[in-house]
Amino acid sequence: MRLACTFVFAFTLALLCGGTGHSLRVPIAPLTMEFHSGNLHLKAFFWKPNGPGPFPAVLFNHGSGGPDAAHTAGIPITQAAERLAPVFVKHGYAFFFPFRRGQGLSADQAPFLQDVLQREEAERGKEAREHLKFVLMTTEQLDDVVAALAFLRTLPEIDSHRVAVTGHSFGGQLTLLAAERDADLRAAVTFAAAAESWERSPELRERLLTAVHKATAPILFIQAANDYSTAVSRDLASELERLQKPCLKRIYPPVGKSAEDGHNVIYTDIPLWEDDVFKFLNEGLTR
């Protein structure tokens, strides 16, 4: 797929799909699965359309900025998964939502990331916190994503050659790193990746620029205009355009009243991004 980078200003549980040209009844309850990341036993939610498959699959990387291990983007993390899954399944995609170490159903496998970072800031200051966040993102947190992708491809219901990765906020950063690591991914979609960190962390900027340089999958950057900052989407998309690599950028009008509202557009205004995301995924996973 060849897309020029463009700039555009541009839940109800659905039971029948319309995006694939045929009806697929959406299962309400997920399957809970377990996979290994090193010595850890991590959990994941899994949904798929009815039928034997194999289906194209989307792995979703949740954020890590909630007040505790059970929340993301201001809502329970399990509810976040349940809010998104029907949208992907109705378009014909299996949806895999791994809980990384220390969070959600994997909270018993490690300390919650924010607790670790807050302790680091209290002992050594904000710069030390940012550096530790970067280190953990590029090591153990990324390890969990890579392990989840490997596990997902072993499932008999999945077409292992048609897998995409998506993510929100911190999970959006991991999505870019996964796209760099895994040359077999067919598409990557980030929602509000690095919106709070891009301008204050030179090492993060350098690392994500390197990631998009090396990634082979088409990348879609999504943000609302009132996110904390949209510089990351603008800068990364501009770099991909310079390199003549396939990408797309969507910066939508403001959502809600605050930067946090804009940051969490993935959960608060699904109809705003749904058409763009599935057009992009459909093109990427059928090329």
Could you describe each region identified by the protein language model?
Residues 137-214:
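Primarily recognizes the serine-hydrolase "nucleophile elbow" in alpha/beta-hydrolase
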Residues 187, 193-248:
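The feature captures the conserved acid-bearing segment of alpha/beta-hydrolase catalytic domains
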Residues 56, 61-63, 223-224:
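The conserved beta1-alpha1 loop
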Residues 53-55, 64-107, 197-198, 229-230:
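Short substrate-entry loop that stabilizes the transition state in hydrolases
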Residues 109, 113-156:
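Alpha/beta-hydrolase active-site loop
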Residues 61, 98-100, 191, 252:
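Alpha/beta-hydrolase
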